[in-house]
Each structure stands twice: as C-alpha cells, then as structure tokens.
Amino acid sequence: MLGRMASAQDLLILALCGLLLELPAGYHATDTRQPRLRLSHKELWDLNRTSVFHSPFGYLGLHIMLLDEYQERLFVGGRDLLYSLSLDRISNNYREIHWPSTPLQAEECIIKGRDADECANYVRVLHRYNRTHLLACGTGAFDPVCTFIRVGHPSEDHLFQLESHKFERGRGRCPFDPTSSFTSILIGGELFTGLYSDYWGRDAAVFRTMNRMAHLRTEPDSEHLLKEPKFVGSYMIPDNEDHDDNKVYLFFTEKALEAETSTHAIYTRVGRVCVNDMGGQRIVVNKWSTFLKTRLVCSVPGRNGIDTHFDELEDVFLLQTRDNKNPVIFGLFSTTSNIFRGYAICVYHMAIVRAAFNGPYAHKEGPEYYWALYEGKVPYPRPGSCASKVNGGLYTTTKDYPDEAVHFARSHPLMYQPIKPVHKRPILVKTDGKYNLKQIAVDRVEAEDGQYDVLFIGTDNGIVLKVITIYNQETESMEEVILEELQVFKVPIPILSMEISSKRQQLYIGTESVIAQVKFHQCDMYGTACADCCLARDPYCAWDGISCSRYYPTGMQAKRRFRRQDVRHGNAAQQCFGQQFIGEVLEKTEERLVYGIEYNSTLLEYTPRTLQAKVNWFVQRAHETKKEEVKTDERIIKMDLGLLFLKLHRLDAGTYFCQTVEHSIVHTVRKITLEIVEEERVDEMFSKDYEEEISHKMPCPMQSNIPQVSKPWYKEFLQLIGYSNFQRVEEYCEKVWCTDKKRKKLKMSPSKWKYANPQEKRQDQEKKARIRPEHYRLPRNIADS
C-alpha cells in the first residue's frame, strides 16, 4: 500500500490535527474519561438499538413528556399537539390530539404584542389524574387553559381523546409564557406548581390548586421567599408512615439574599411545603404557612478551604429505592461564572436533607447585619412542620397553629444549614468544554461485585453519555467511567427531556423536533473475547463463557453459571484466567505493508476500538531483533488516527507494532511494515513516456475492446521498490482501477493524465503557459489503499 503524498496544505492540516489529538498530560494506561464506545446515529440505527418519532406535521415544539407504565405509553405535549406513543417502539401505533389556541385567543395575544409562535398553545402540564384520565394544561396564547384527556384502560385500544367540554382557566396551574421555567406535581388530585403566574412573567410563586383543599400560594412581592427563581423539579417524598406528614420538595435556583460578597450570586435551593397545609387563620390567609427553603451545595473541595461551587441547577432526578421514604437525589449543576464553564453531578441522601430542615434557622437582625444562626426561642409547633400525629397530634390543621409559630415561619423561611452531597464532593465533574450537560436519568443495577448507579446524561448537541462512578474510600476520590457516547440524533440538537424505564431497559429522549428511544445496553458491541467484556466494566454486561451478554443477578433468569465480570477494577487478567484471551487477540493481529515516498508524509493508520486504551508504537529495524518505542517529535506525531510521519526519512523503514494497554492487558493489534521509496527512483519513473498507457488506463474485464497495454506503469514502479509478487498486486490494482473507472467516469477520463510526463509538457509549451505538474501525485485510490 502506498502512503498518500500530501500537498503543503494537507501537511499543515495533518500537523495541526496531530497537535490537537495528542494524548493529554497525565494520560494513564486506561483513560476512563474517554468513552469506551462511541456510536454514531447510523451505528445505533443499524444495530436496531434506537427508534425515532417525527411529527407528521413537521414540527413538535416539545415541552413535556410523561412515561406511564400502566398505560404502556409515552405521552408527549408540544405546540398545539399531544401524542400518545408506544413504549415498546415509539415510531409505531401512535395517537395524536390537535389542541391549538382558539382564534380569539390568538388574535388577542397578537394584539398585545406577542408574535404568532408565542401565541400557539404549548402543553406544559401532563399528569396522570386517575387510571383513565390525564390532566393537561397549555399556555393558550398567553391565556392558560386546562382540561382532561381520556386514555381509558390499556385494553381499550389506546383511547386518546380531549374532553373539550371540561376546559378550565389555568392560571396558577400553567405559565403564560411557553419559555418560562416551570415545575408541577399532582398529588391526590391537588396540583402543586412552581411558576411565574402573570402575563409579564414577574410574579414567581409556588401554588396549590385544583381540588378540595384551599388554593394556596407564596406571598407576592416577598423576595425573602423567592427572588427571581428558576424552577427545575418537584417531588413528593414521605417522611414516615403518617400521610398527614407528607411534604413536597421543590428544586430551584434563585438570587441569594444571604450572599454577602455579591448581590448577583445564584444559589440552588430545596424548598419544602406540607401537602396538607391549609394556610393561617388570621395571618397568611390562603398563603403557605409551612414554606421553608435551604441551600443545596455542590462543590469541589479546594486548597485552603476555598471550594469550587457549581451553583446553577440544570436538572434533578429522583432515584426510587425499595424504601420510598429514602430515595436518592441526583442533581446536575453548572457553574455561574462567565470565565470558567463546568458541570458537576452531586448525590444527596434524604437523611441529610431532613437534617437540614430540622436544624437551626437563618436569621438577620437588620440591613446592617450579617446572616447568622438563630439562637433565640423557637415556638411550638416547630415552624414549617405539618399538622400530623408525628407532630404531637395537638393540631389537626395549620389554621389552628398559634400566630407566633406562623409568624416565625413567615419571617424565617431560610434554614441555616445547607445540604451537602454524599462524600462532600461531586461524583462527576466535567470542565473540558467538550460537553454541555443538560439532562440526567439514573438506573440502579445489581452487578457481580455490588450495586452501581448508571447515569444517562443528555447534552445540548444530541449526545447521551452512559457513565458509572466508583468511589475509592482509601483515597477519598471518585473514578468516572464513561461506558458509551451515543449520538442519538442524526444532527446535533439540544436534549430537552429524558424519561427512563428500568422495566423495559429503555431511555426516552425528547428534543424540540424529534423523540428517540435507546436501549440501555448492547453487550456484544464490546468485543468477542472475555478480556474485551471485562475491561468494558459495564454493570449490564458479563462474559458468559461464549459471548459478552446481559448480566442477571443470581436467581434472575441466570442462564449460565459461568459469569465473568469486574466492574470495580476491570481486572480482565484475573477474570479471564484460563480463557486464553491474550492468545485470541494476538491471533487477530492485522498485518499490513505500507510504501512511503522519501520526504513525503505517511500515516500508519490505527483507530482503537475503545478510546480508553493507551496506544503505544514500537519499531523493529531491518536486520534487528530488538524493538524500541517510537519517539515522537515535530516530525513524527502520535495521533488518535495512528502514527503520522510529516517527512519520511530512509531510516524510518522497518516493522511497526501498534499495542493497546488497558489494566496491564497488552494487545498487539496491528503490525505494519513500512518500506521507503527513494525520491530519485520516483523521479526516474515519471520521466519516462507513459502517455499511451496512462491515457488508456487499465484494461477492465468488461471492456475487452480496449487495447491491452503490455506493461502498466505501476509494474515498473513495483520493480523499482523491489516487490516481486506481481500477480497478486496486478489483480488488486486492476480491481482498484476498474472500480474507480465505473465510479468516476468523468473525473478519471484520459485527459486527466495527459500531462503526467514532464517532457511532453515542455513540447506543448508553445500552445499554453508552462505549468509544472504535480508529478508525485498518484491515483487517489492507490494512494489511500
């Protein structure tokens, strides 16, 4: 194979690529910061691992997705539309509802100064109301409206009908603006929302509306309660078996009044209200009497006690456990700095959250004072607590609370103690600028060596990262292992929403214009050897003695007793002992012969199947038995694509061995013999008269009428470099030449090579200006082969 001879521009590009693609400093034998597998949209599609849904109207305007395992449907709310999609395959058997703004709503909206897009009806609320109905609310051209959708029972052939006779005003239930931040949760027929409740987007509040209980909200124009919040998520998490003690937790960011060093500091908050709050009797009438909040911290400990904070909450995910009172909270955060951009994921346990809300209150004596711990007497019942038996049972409703307790909660909504993450640090940090992380979903998996939380992280360019993190107690550090990088969509597009089904092992991903589903795993993609499977460290996968396949814990469809898996350490040598895994790989070592022209560039190509492996290059010179590691410099550059020689020297000739290293497992994956062709011999070859042979090119089998040339030009070239197996090379070159002829009839016409001989060109200089040809250039197919 001939190394392609590049122009000066090509050399410059390759050199720049080499500098950019060099391995970073401190690169270890296994770089788990790189994805083990990187799968394109086409590869996912070819593997039948994904399915996509496009709206037949050409647009979707996605704002919300609701995964309903009972109905076995994914409900989607967008612009003027609702969809019901099958969880098994979202592209099949879908139902749709067209729900636009009324002409009157749209007309009034435009008169008020909004554009036509804003005056559509964007569905922002979708909740399962009961077994047969959904609650849906839309922006209604800046005039929110709510209704019910009949979905029936799963046996009713996927019923999906809008009940238009039940329209209700949606103020306090749905935002006016389709782009404003919003969160909602439906509990016992009561809708709890965090939103901006007015036309101009100035009145931020937490509401409870809908059913038998009194409508409540936070007090308007109270910056100590909410100051320009961005609502992210909300969940009902019980504290105990007493349902009267249930609380709703709201996650949001806001400008922090207690930040003494900056008036524009942004903090992430956890707010809390009692589900059965009825407000006060004489003060805070129809207002929350139990609203409290505290800071949610996600930071990297630094030297001298100065931490790096990630204060902007992007997304939050609640991982349910067997104990519904103690789910695990995952927060995806970003920095608020205009200089430094980074992302982090922190994990919180409910015990830490409850301890913060049961701790001391924050207090400020006056404008000239700093925020401090409140050390005075706390009234009874404890401000912010619910009217329940757990609280003593003396009060059946918050309306009966003493004015002192209600007033204290009203004036002291902020807790002094922040909520800090597990291990006092993030489980994952991204500061390389490669990804902008936006969404998170988590699945808990039982593996051979323990329990792991698999993170699925959505980015702003349509990529999903599949990651696990492992905590090292000895070093108090986290190891992040990126298992897969999945290009879910054909073109880069921000991921707006993700829903996860552990039951089906499927991830549902929403963007503004398209929805996709992706299977959690495809174990056979890691490789066909035991070592490949164990080195992957995917808790879903294990070596079963024959292939890399889905791992099932003992007693759960365990088909084979032979299971090899080591997620924590990836110790393939120990797990695969006796499997002859090294021999299997070495037998597959690919051998190649590459010819390069002296003083030109050549790339010895190899792209490792896994990006986590360290790639080493060794060379064995002619007539030598010793191998030595290739030393890189400004002329020889190690790239992700292989080993690049910017300018070949005669001494570069030899046999090159490409090795990958992972967890002490060394694979020799490619053996390349590099032959150097002296520049003088190439000049001699091109100085001969080959016009007739080149103009006719190679005789193709289907074109017997073309005169056969006695000696194609490449044969003499092979004689110059000393290659003797003419028959094999001739068959290959005929195949390349004739394939190229069929594919590029116009581009490869005889006129293209008319002036390949410099002597002929000099004879023709009387007719046209003399232009020296690129006499080193060869047919591209041969150069690239």
From Swiss-Prot:
It comes from the Eukaryota. Residues 744-785 are annotated as: Disordered. Residues 759-777 have a biased composition (Basic and acidic residues). Residues 36-520 form the Sema domain. CDD domains: Ig_Sema3, Sema_3E. Gene3D superfamilies: ligand-binding face of the semaphorins, domain 2 (3.30.1680.10), YVTN repeat-like/Quinoprotein amine dehydrogenase (2.130.10.10). Residues 1-25 form the signal peptide. GO terms for cellular component: extracellular space; plasma membrane. GO terms for biological process: angiogenesis; axon guidance; negative chemotaxis; neural crest cell migration; positive regulation of cell migration; semaphorin-plexin signaling pathway. It is found in: Secreted. SMART domains: PSI, Sema. Disulfide bonds join 109-119, 137-146, 274-386, 298-346, 523-541, 658-733. Keywords: Angiogenesis, Developmental protein, Differentiation, Disulfide bond, Glycoprotein, Immunoglobulin domain, Neurogenesis, Secreted, Signal. Collapsin-1, -2, -3, and -5 bind to overlapping but distinct axon tracts. Its main location: secreted. Strong binding to neuropilin is mediated by the carboxy third of the protein. Plays an important role in signaling via the cell surface receptor PLXND1. Mediates reorganization of the actin cytoskeleton, leading to the retraction of cell projections. Promotes focal adhesion disassembly and inhibits adhesion of endothelial cells to the extracellular matrix. Regulates angiogenesis. Can down-regulate sprouting angiogenesis. Required for normal vascular patterning during embryogenesis. Induces the collapse and paralysis of neuronal growth cones. Plays an important role in ensuring the specificity of synapse formation. Belongs to the semaphorin family. This is Semaphorin-3E. It comes from Gallus gallus.
